[in-house]
UniProtKB/Swiss-Prot annotation:
Keywords: Cell inner membrane, Cell membrane, Membrane, Transmembrane, Transmembrane helix. The chain crosses the membrane at residues 6-26. This is PhoP/PhoQ regulator MgrB. The lineage of its organism: Bacteria, Pseudomonadati, Pseudomonadota, Gammaproteobacteria, Enterobacterales. Belongs to the MgrB family. It is a single-pass membrane protein.
Amino acid sequence: MKKFRWVVLGIVVVVCLLLWAQVFNIMCNQDVQFFSGICAINKFIPW
């Protein structure tokens, strides 16, 4: 049962990361000033 909980936790983390990547892409496309520096770094991370 403990292993199942770790699997669920792992899936939740992956989904959160994917959603975060989507938010980043939207913000970068909007060219929000605050995100411009983060977007530069984000381009080097292969999502």
